[in-house]
Each structure stands twice: as C-alpha cells, then as structure tokens.
From Swiss-Prot:
Catalytic residues as annotated in Swiss-Prot or TrEMBL: 221 (nucleophile)
Protein localization: Periplasm
CDD domains: Ntn_CA
Family: Belongs to the peptidase S45 family.
Swiss-Prot/TrEMBL keywords: Hydrolase, Periplasm, Quorum sensing, Signal, Zymogen
Gene: pvdQ
Protein name (record): Acyl-homoserine lactone acylase PvdQ
Length: 772
C-alpha cells in the first residue's frame, strides 16, 4: 500500500458552523484531528476507501455513500428520528407502508435522547470515531450536492438536513429492533388502557400482521461455506447470498475499507453503518443468514382489577410506568400541531395492544421484552469481524461480545476450515422455563410468558454478554472441513453428518420441516465431488424451482384426467422448464398460485414430514385422493382467474412480468418454491410485478496461495438515485448472470478500466481533488 496521499489545505468556503457541531462526539475530549480520506472508484462505482485512522475512514464512507444515496439516508434519518409527520403529515406512509404517525410515535419512544446517548457512550473510541467521521463526510457531501441541486428523490429538500453521530445510532437501533419490538410498531403506538382506548383501524393491524409474516421472506439469505475436504483447491470457499430489501434502510452498499497496516476489508454494509456487514479480508470470508431464533418474548400481565394501568407481580400491585411521547404533525394547511400519546411499560417492557390477538382489557395486558434493546455491542462486533485475522479470532469475538443481533454467521478461512454459528442475542428461556411459565393459549409462533411471577424472568448467566440472554456455550456452533450451509432453517441441518440438536426451542428446533431452499442446497452439496466457484454460482443462477421436482410430475399426472376448464393451466405446466428464469413461461405463475393454495392443506402431501428423514420429506402430491384432486382443480380455476385479473398475457415470459423499478427484467422467484435465487416481488401495474426484496449483495470468495479471489455484484446497483450512472448497471449484469471480479488488491484496483480517485479532507474546506 503506498503512502497515503493527503490533500493540501485549500482556501475555499468552509462548511457551515452548524455542520461542525453535528460531527462532534458526545464525550468531552480534545478536538479531533482533521479527517482525510482517499476514495478510489472502480467498475460500477464501487468505492475503495483509504484513511490513516477511523475518523478518516468514516469520513470517506459517509461522503461516498452520500454521492450515491443522499436522499435515501436522509429519508431513513427522518424516519428513525420520528419526524415524518412534521414534513409529510400523519396519514402519509413510510416505505414499509406504515402510517407516519404510528412510525413517529414508535421511533420517538425507541430513540429517546437518553437511549441514544447511552448507546453512543458505550462505544469504544474507534467506533465513535467511525460514526463522527461518517456524519462529517455525509454533511460535506450534502453541502456540495445542495449547491449543485439536490437529486429528484429529495423532493423539495426541506426535510434533508445535516446528520450527527446520534442519527447514525438511531439507524443502528432501528436495525437492532427489526427482529423484535420493531415488528410491533402499530401495537406499541396504539396501546391504551381499556377506559381510554380509541377505535383502531383493523386494516392497519392487518398490514402489520402481513409485514410480520413477510419478515423472513424479505430478509432471508443463503450461505455455503466449503472447507478443504470439498473445495476444488483444498482451501476455503464461500457463497454469500443475502436476501434483503431493494429499497430503504436495509439496502446494502458495496465498499472496501482500508487503514494501512490495521484494516483491509471488502464487502457490503447497510445504510448508515461505517463497517462491513458481509465480506472478506486477506484471511477469511464471512456472511450471515437471518436465523430462526427468537429475539423477544411477550409477557402476559395480570392486571389489578381496580386499575388496568397496574399489574400484579408476585402478589403485589405495581403501577405501569408512563412516558409521554410528543410528535409534531403537519396539517393540510401547512401548520404544525402536536400530538401526545402515553406509552405504558411494565418492568418487562412496553405494553403492546393488538386487537383480537393481544388485547388490553380489564384482566390482562401484554408487554414485549426485546433482547436486542440492550445490545450496544453490534457495531463493535462487526468492526472486530472486519479486522479478524483468523477463523478462531472471528469465532472468539462473536462468542465473547455476543453482538450479532438476529443472524447466523458462516465463514471460511484460507486454510480450509468452515464455520457455522447460530450465536445471536437470544432470551435465556430454556425448556424448563417454558414448561413452567409459557402460556398454552399463546397464538401462533409468539412466545408468551407469565408476567405475574418474577420466577418467569429470563434466566441470567454470568458468562453471557448481557443479563437475560443465552451464553455462547449454550448456542449452536459447528466447525468442519467439508461444508456448512444455511438457508434460514434452524441450526439442525447445517451439515447432516453432524446434526445440531438439544437446544432451547427459542434457539433452534429439530421437529419442523426444512425450507425448500435448504433442501435444494443439501441436494446440491451431497456426495464427495469437489466444489469450485462455478458450482456454487450455479446454485444461484440455475434458477431451479426445487419444489417442482417434488410435485410437478404428480400435477402433470393429474392433468391427464383434468376437465377442459383448466387445460390452459395444464398446458402451461407441461411447457414450463421448471425454472424461475427470464425465459420461463406462465407455468411458473400457475405453479406458484397452485402451491400457495395447497400450502394451506398439508394433508395434500403424499409423504408427510418425517423428522427422521428431513432432507426428503414431505414430498409428492397425493392427487389420487379425491379431496386433493378437488383442491388442485379449485386452485387451478382460481389461478386462471387471478392471472386474467392481473393482466398477465398468456404467452408472457417471467422476465416480462418480474422487473426492477427501471424495467430491467429480474430472474429468480419465491423462496417458498425452493428458488435459491429468492426474489420477492409485488403486483405493480397491469401484468407486472415489482421486485422489492431478494438477492442483494452476491459474493463468491475462494482462497489461493496469493489470498482471496472474489466475484460478485450488488443486484440492485450502488445508487438509489434514478439519474445516477450506477442506478441499474449491476442490475442489468445480474439479469445477464454476469458476476464480475471484485477488485481487492492494490494491483486489481488500479488496473480497473474505470479507476478514478478522489481525495477529501476536512482541512480543504470543501474542495475535492479528483485524479484520473
């Protein structure tokens, strides 16, 4: 690495004094040195950022990110600050289709000044410097871009403002809450005692329920870590295929971070984070998949019959805590008013109210306790992973810090070891505590504990990183030299040769069917054949619909005796290639509709799920049974009606139906069908479906004698700004299955045909030095 080239001081107009104030840390300390960064861009606009220290590194990240996604981050900061209603009114909606008012009430509660400052104070100096630098870099870019004219995505720009370290903490806390209390936004914002309860929209809660059910589908992932015994060259090999939203606050950004002699890591990060979440360095490569572990529990409160805002604990009546939340709301005439709500809490957590599911009446109420609200270690955790020089160092860091919020970790090293960790922040509720304290009337997958007894509090272990969570020794861990894999299944079948069992149901279960993607992966990985990058890439790009291999022959057999009114469905199924590729026909659409209907009837399987044979059950469709035959016929008729109403042409190809926002055809399909390249799309106009989530940062890393070699892409491209040259370039490459070399070494970066360099420094007072 060459000596870092700092920019000479420039005599240009300085940043506004207000921006300087925003970049200062919360702790009293000497004024930090001016931040500097060198940003080298390669193909697709990917920044490779070099700095001498963390503040400079954060400065470069914030500046680069704001060149591509200024309005996206500004919008997310507005959301997590609880200020949407101030600018857009109470009835507008967030990207997640939440009413602004409910969102603002929730985030004003979640990100109180005390909670945000406590989180920031808990960070080590290195992380505080990264955050302060990021805010300063973003603010510099904001000044420059406002001078040039803000992107169209910023609208009138009234709501776009400088940011601070505290704003970045708010974004981080929102990410932490995604797997817990963040799924109860409306339920928390609307919770009121029965004597004060207002009429609540059932439609709003129906939307909230739909979002809960979509959580795993929109934030899934595939991962395969191959060790020396199975990799083609006897070294580590990793496939990272996270499935995340294509818009908003969970949209990945590709970048390389370098502090010479200390840090050199390449990968992708979520908005507002100055660290790499999924990536590789000289020694190892890692990725994450959303886990099936529970990260919160509910507590059923026994209320004092004299007062529904008091609850009984161990025979004593205790008052609920009350917190007044105030939100500014813009009226139709442009004037501002203030709305107040009370958030009630027990010692377990905030009270939530979900009509018909979690009712607050005279007898009972429900509190939610989210383990990740006490996780201030998450940024430090990823920064330590970024700097890890061995698989042992990565594993030791995850076990000690326990900062991973709600994902599994899979990794390989250059020596050919493969690692799987289901070690996130999970409430310490074992089977014994469940047997003693759980509510047998609890609905669905929610864990509801008895809130009338202190004995039902989460257990505390001195070796855990925080009170009330499982220590690492009680969480699944597996290290092998053949392979480990995960596609959002429990830890159980990470490698069938060594099943992981015996854990709390809140951690991992082994009594439920594997997902179709997991079964597909295990089928591809079975045997002893050596695996290379091409084999792992084809797992994604083959676009195979695994479920079709299990039931399509039965459907075609049924079609031989089907009535004339469903022959169009049968013809399309017979002509379908069994894939979710751009050229796949309407058979894919009808197959998906049929499966969605039959999924409600598990008795339709010819061979039911058998825990002793999870890789091969359930399978087959019992079409020979009259009841199943009727179900298939009804589903086929419904599919014809649905296709007709959606406006999809009978001869349409999948690439003409499923597209990105700019119209780029997108391959892939529903994860429930076993499509490894999982893509989640929604109806969007006549005969079209818009991709909103799915394959995001796709990374394949192999290790050689010279270090890591990587190929991949960012499926939705670097920039969320329509006018950017990098708004859809990688999306087109994704559609064409053209994964590119990911430049990592100095030679690879400088050899890139689109190489350009930018040098920025706080000393230069706003000037940018660009070198061709």
């Amino acid at each position: 690495m060459p000596v870092f080239p700092f920019c000479r001081p420039m005599t240009c107009a300085g940043l506004a004094a207000a921006l300087v104030a925003f970049s200062v840390g919360v702790q009293a300390q000497p004024a930090p040195a001016d931040a500097s960064a060198q940003i080298r861009y390669t193909r697709y606009g990917v920044p490779h950022i070099v700095a001498k220290d963390e503040r400079g590194l954060g400065y470069g990240v914030g500046y680069a990110y704001a060149q591509d996604n200024l309005c996206l981050l500004a919008n997310e900061v507005l959301t997590v600050s609880g200020e949407r209603s101030r600018y857009f009114g109470a009835k507008g909606q967030t990207l997640e289709q939440r009413d602004n008012l409910a969102s603002d009430l929730f985030f004003t509660w979640l990100n109180s000044p005390a909670a945000v400052d406590a989180f920031l104070q808990a960070q080590p100096a290195s992380v505080q410097a990264l955050l302060a630098g990021y805010a300063s870099g973003y603010n510099r870019a904001l000044v420059e871009r406002r001078r040039q004219g803000l992107p169209a995505e910023c609208g009138d720009g009234e709501w776009v403002r400088p940011i601070s370290s505290q704003d970045l903490v708010k974004l981080t806390r929102r990410l932490l809450a995604e797997g817990g209390v963040g799924q109860f936004v409306e339920a928390l914002a609307g919770a009121q005692p029965p004597t004060l309860a207002r009429a609540q929209s059932s439609a709003g809660f129906a939307s909230a329920l739909a979002r809960q059910e979509r959580f795993a589908a929109e934030r899934g992932s595939n991962a395969v870590a191959v060790g020396a015994q199975r990799s083609a060259n006897g070294r580590g090999l990793l496939l990272a295929n996270p499935h995340f939203p294509w818009m908003g606050g969970m949209r990945f950004y590709q970048m390389q971070l370098t502090i010479p002699g200390q840090l050199d890591v390449m990968g992708a990060a979520l908005p507002g984070l100055p660290v790499v979440n999924i990536g590789f360095n000289q020694h190892l490569a890692w990725t994450h998949t959303v886990d099936t572990s529970k990260h919160f529990t509910l507590y059923r409160l026994q209320l004092d019959p004299k007062d529904p805002t008091r609850y009984v604990l161990d025979g004593k009546s205790l008052p609920m805590a009350r917190q007044t939340i105030r939100v500014a709301v813009k009226g139709t005439d442009g004037s501002l008013s203030q709305i107040e709500r009370q958030v009630y809490s027990s010692q377990f957590g905030p009270v939530v109210q979900w009509p018909g599911r979690l009712d607050w009446d005279a007898q009972a109420a429900y509190s939610v306790r989210d383990a990740n609200l006490e996780n201030s270690r998450v940024l430090q955790q990823w920064y330590q992973i970024n700097r890890a020089d061995s698989l042992a160092a990565l594993k030791g860091s995850v076990e000690q810090l326990q900062g991973i919020p709600w994902v599994n970790t899979l990794a390989v090293d250059q020596g050919g070891r493969a690692l799987y960790l289901n070690q996130s922040v999970v409430p310490y509720v074992d089977q014994q505590l469940l047997d003693t304290c759980s509510n047998p009337q609890a609905q669905g997958r929610l864990v509801v504990l008895d809130g009338s007894r202190s004995a039902c509090q989460w257990k505390v272990d001195a070796q855990a990183a925080q009170p009330g969570i499982f220590p690492a020794r009680l969480l699944p861990s597996l290290e092998r030299e053949d392979f480990v894999q995960n596609s959002n299944d429990p830890a159980w079948m990470a490698n069938p040769a060594q099943p992981l069992t015996g854990y709390s149901p809140l951690v991992s279960r082994n009594d439920q069917p594997l997902g179709m993607r997991g079964r597909f992966a295990l089928q591809r990985l079975q045997g002893k054949a050596r695996l290379g990058v091409d084999e792992l890439q084809r797992m994604v790009t083959d676009e195979e619909v695994y479920l079709a291999s299990l039931v399509l022959p039965d459907l075609l057999q049924w079609c031989k005796g089907a009535s004339a009114d469903v022959q169009a469905v049968c013809s399309s199924l017979a002509a379908w290639n069994g894939k979710a590729d751009l050229d796949s026909g309407m058979g894919l659409v009808h197959f998906q509709n049929l499966f969605n209907a039959l999924a409600e009837h598990p008795e339709s399987w010819r061979v039911a799920f058998n825990p002793a044979d999870p890789q091969h059950t359930p399978r087959g469709l019992a079409v020979e049974q009259a009841a199943v035959s009727r179900l298939v016929h009804q589903a086929a008729l419904a599919s014809l009606k649905q296709v007709s109403e959606s406006g999809v042409a009978g001869a349409a190809r999948w690439g003409q139906v499923q597209q990105a926002l700019d119209g780029t055809p997108v391959p892939g399909g529903p994860q429930a069908l076993g499509v490894y390249n999982a893509i989640y799309s929604v109806p969007h106009g006549q005969g079209k479906r818009l991709v909103v989530s799915g394959t995001s940062y796709l990374q394949l890393v192999s290790f050689t004698d010279k270090g890591p070699e990587a190929r991949g892409l960012l499926a939705f491209s670097q920039s969320s700004e329509k006018a950017s040259a990098h708004a859809s370039d990688q999306t087109k490459a994704f559609a064409a299955k053209q994964l590119a070399l990911i430049p990592f070494t100095e030679a690879q970066i400088k050899a890139d045909p689109e190489y350009r360099e930018v040098v920025i420094s706080e000393r230069d007072k706003g000037a940018v030095v660009s070198q061709p």
